[in-house]
């Protein structure tokens, strides 16, 4: 059911071995979005360390094909308490393909600034 939580970018959940819904309580922390984002990326780093693949599915501020807020859809699907907010779902499983790292020659180093913005 979670594979329908967004109008695009969540259909692969139907084949995922594992889906981790990342939640936070906005009443407990004013930086809940940042905290949940850190938790999401740490899940992805741990999956990679285990030789697994992962994909972040953004839920906050997204909508289903029917226009229902994705967070509301996930709340109803999993009976999540109302005070908790859904930031993301991290799908984990065996990698469908191995991506090559970016070639350093093609990195946009002009977007990296040291000491001050615009300083060379």
Model regions: which residues?
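Acidic, surface-exposed loops and disordered segments
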Residues: 1-120
């Amino acid at each position: 059911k979670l594979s329908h939580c967004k109008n695009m970018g969540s259909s692969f959940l139907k084949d995922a071995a594992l889906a981790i819904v990342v939640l936070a309580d906005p009443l407990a922390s004013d930086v809940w979005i940042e905290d949940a984002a850190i938790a999401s990326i740490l899940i992805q780093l741990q999956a990679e360390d285990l030789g697994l693949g992962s994909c972040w599915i953004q839920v906050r501020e997204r909508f289903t094909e029917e226009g229902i807020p994705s967070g509301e859809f996930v709340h109803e699907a999993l009976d999540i308490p109302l005070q908790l907010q859904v930031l993301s779902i991290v799908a984990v499983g065996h990698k469908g393909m191995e991506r090559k790292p970016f070639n350093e020659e093609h990195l946009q180093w002009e977007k990296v600034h040291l000491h001050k913005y615009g300083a060379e």
